[in-house]
């Protein structure tokens, strides 16, 4: 989500480009990240000049064509994915404050922006946008003028200490024609090192046409770049160093982060997708706050049935969510395929809450289900990854999954983000209705916050899974078994193989094995089994281990996904894929990832285009 570019060169050099050229082209390179507005600020003739526009970079180009910017060697630019405030010209970046002297662009979410806005308003600051970025820019201006004695680097360090959340900030000031100052925390920022010029970018795509030498910053660091050098400090002012690296891939590959496909990149994006979906949704006391849910609390307390509607992968995310929502809220919860929902005359009323899941927000089947639900008096919450799409506009309220753009047709990171957002909704309802005590909600949120790191641990072990996929590329059929939250994970694992490897695959509830599917088991049949935690409160673990014994006895090749330390599976598994220990309801965020990696490896070994599988489209906009 969002893209940032910064450039500084030398006055009077022989280059045939200026900051405007570098920054706008960098923004184009970052378009794949997804955005809804774009803008640029430059330093020229002792002043800050800027242009910004809702829409694509082409709209910004048109704005600049109408009102040209002067030549400059210093500039910053931004493509915005709306979070605080809608996708409008006013909310677009840069935000220019301090009587036009300071320009700031920002990626991320400032969690304490409301508190800071109140503080600054009391000091006489007026805000024209709805964004957290304008608040951060005004705080930087206040500190620059009152504490830092005109030192932009010091002001950025002190500002970083005041901000909470995830952010990358770039700033230029009319009083400094020789520098850009930037800060980062839990949001990417890379320095591009040139000769007589330097760059900043949210990733190397923003400057790869100009240099292959880059430096990665760590969290809570500030960098000041000039045309000839850069200096890195920590927020406390102490000196720091970055991590230099050479970019080995070309501009086209850079959009994929150096991976061979968007799907592979998006699998690797999943820790950030979950982290960003959680970001900004807790107050300073650790209480869950979903400001986006603009439905009266009395109505939410009166809900007596929840219906989740979705298609494809999103429907499986809904099936996972059902287990959690019913468990936490004690509200009957159904999951319906959106295209079947309105044709069976569902029983809905004003006490029904319909939750619609869609990555694109344009899935026609889901939109039609939502329209039918609202006609029956039900309230609708949309869980969506695309700001400004139709579904959030037609729903009563929306929760955005901040997974960033998902380019590959087969969904990966959106699936985990949808589960995460659905869990937040369930916890919020439980908190609101008094089904869970504050400490219980806090404990569950703590578990959710641990998931990005644990997902990364699964990804770090991907070579074993890739090798397995390559070795099984000639399989004719693969089966998947799971119980409880592992059942929809099994369905999703099968769907991934169907979508991108064109391989027959089926997912089953493991308890159904004796009721028919065991007839499919024959010598050499690969079967994935998602094993629940042995620390669960019921006997599901031992039952699934028995299932493994049954299929192994009939010649199946058993591929077991089990927690670290679960030794009960050792004697019955041909292959074991270990995942970190986690509470039962958190397991799908981990156990899904090996299945994605496996499917991608099988499809790649078969020579298929994993990003654009045959006959499929990313957004299904017809019924």
UniProtKB/Swiss-Prot annotation:
EC number: 2.6.1.16
Residue span(s) of domain Glutamine amidotransferase type-2: 2-228
Catalytic activity: D-fructose 6-phosphate + L-glutamine = D-glucosamine 6-phosphate + L-glutamate
InterPro entries per UniProt: GATase_2_dom, GFAT, GFAT_N, GlmS/AgaS_SIS, GlmS/FrlB_SIS, Ntn_hydrolases_N, SIS_dom, SIS_dom_sf
Keywords of this entry: Aminotransferase, Cytoplasm, Glutamine amidotransferase, Repeat, Transferase
Annotated GO CC locations: cytosol
Gene Ontology MF, one: glutamine-fructose-6-phosphate transaminase (isomerizing) activity
Pfam family for this entry, one: SIS
Residues of the SIS domain: 295-435, 468-613
GO process terms (BP): carbohydrate metabolic process; fructose 6-phosphate metabolic process; protein N-linked glycosylation; UDP-N-acetylglucosamine metabolic process
Annotated localization: Cytoplasm
Cytoplasm keyword on record: yes
Superkingdom, natural source: Bacteria
Active site: 2, 618
Subunit structure: Homodimer.
Function, in words: Catalyzes the first step in hexosamine metabolism, converting fructose-6P into glucosamine-6P using glutamine as a nitrogen source.
PANTHER family: GLUCOSAMINE--FRUCTOSE-6-PHOSPHATE AMINOTRANSFERASE, ISOMERIZING (PTHR10937), GLUTAMINE--FRUCTOSE-6-PHOSPHATE TRANSAMINASE (ISOMERIZING) (PTHR10937:SF0)
Name of this chain's protein: Glutamine--fructose-6-phosphate aminotransferase [isomerizing]
Source lineage: Bacteria, Bacillati, Actinomycetota, Actinomycetes, Mycobacteriales
Gene name of the record: glmS
């Amino acid at each position: 989500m969002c893209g940032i570019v910064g450039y500084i060169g030398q006055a009077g050099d022989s280059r045939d480009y200026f900051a405007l050229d570098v920054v706008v082209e960098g923004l184009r390179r970052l378009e794949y990240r997804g955005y809804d507005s774009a803008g640029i600020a430059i330093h020229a003739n002792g002043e800050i000049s800027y242009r910004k526009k809702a829409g694509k970079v082409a709209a910004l180009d048109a704005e600049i064509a109408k009102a040209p910017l002067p030549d400059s060697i210093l500039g910053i630019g931004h493509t915005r994915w709306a979070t605080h405030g809608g996708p409008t010209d006013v909310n677009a970046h840069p935000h220019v404050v301090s009587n036009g002297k300071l320009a700031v662009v920002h990626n991320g979410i400032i969690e304490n922006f409301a508190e800071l806005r109140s503080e600054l308003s009391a000091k006489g600051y007026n805000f024209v946008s709805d964004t957290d970025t304008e608040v951060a820019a005004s705080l930087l201006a206040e500190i620059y003028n009152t504490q830092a004695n005109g030192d932009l680097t010091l002001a950025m360090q002190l500002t970083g200490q005041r901000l909470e959340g995830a952010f990358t900030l770039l700033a230029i000031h009319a009083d400094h024609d020789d520098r850009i100052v930037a800060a980062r925390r839990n949001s990417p920022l890379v320095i591009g090192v040139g000769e007589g010029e330097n760059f900043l970018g949210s990733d190397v795509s923003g400057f790869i046409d100009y240099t292959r030498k880059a430096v990665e910053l760590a969290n809570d660091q500030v960098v000041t770049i000039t045309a000839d050098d850069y200096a890195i400090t920590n927020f406390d002012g102490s000196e720091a160093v970055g991590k230099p690296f050479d970019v080995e891939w070309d501009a086209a590959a850079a959009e994929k982060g150096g991976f061979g496909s968007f799907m592979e990149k998006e699998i690797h994006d999943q820790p950030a997708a979950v982290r960003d979906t959680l970001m900004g949704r807790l107050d300073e006391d650790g209480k869950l706050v979903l400001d986006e849910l603009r439905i009266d609390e009395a109505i939410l307390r009166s809900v007596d049935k929840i219906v989740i509607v979705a298609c494809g992968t999103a429907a499986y995310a809904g099936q996972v969510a059902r287990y959690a929502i019913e468990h936490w809220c004690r509200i009957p919860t159904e999951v319906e395929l959106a295209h079947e929902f309105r044709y069976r005359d569902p029983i809905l009323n004003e006490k029904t809450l319909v939750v619609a899941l869609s990555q694109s927000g344009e899935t026609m089947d889901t939109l039609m289900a939502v329209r039918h639900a609202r006609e029956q008096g039900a309230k609708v919450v949309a869980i969506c990854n695309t700001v400004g799409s139709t579904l959030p506009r037609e729903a009563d309220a929306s929760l955005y999954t901040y997974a960033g753009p998902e380019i590959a047709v087969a969904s990966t990171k959106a699936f985990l983000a949808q589960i995460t957002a659905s869990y937040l909704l369930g916890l919020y309802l439980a908190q609101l209705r008094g089904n869970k005590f504050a400490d219980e909600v806090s404990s569950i949120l703590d578990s959710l916050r641990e998931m990005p790191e644990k997902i990364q641990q699964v990804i770090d072990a991907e070579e074993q899974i890739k090798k397995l996929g390559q070795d099984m590329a000639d399989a004719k059929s693969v089966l998947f078994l799971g119980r409880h939250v592992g059942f929809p994970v099994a369905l999703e694992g099968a769907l991934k193989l169907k979508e991108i490897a064109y391989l027959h695959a089926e997912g089953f509830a493991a308890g159904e094995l004796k009721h028919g599917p065991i007839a499919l088991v024959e010598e050499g049949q690969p079967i994935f089994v998602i094993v629940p935690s042995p620390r669960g409160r019921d006997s599901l673990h031992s039952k699934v281990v028995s299932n493994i014994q049954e299929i192994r006895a009939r010649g199946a090749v058993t591929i077991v996904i089990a927690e670290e330390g679960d030794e009960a599976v050792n004697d019955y598994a041909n292959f074991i894929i270990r995942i970190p220990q986690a509470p039962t309801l958190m397991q799908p965020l981990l156990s899904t990832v090996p299945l994605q990696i496996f499917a991608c490896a099988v499809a790649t070994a078969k020579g298929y285009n994993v990003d654009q599988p045959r006959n499929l489209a990313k957004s299904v906009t017809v019924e």
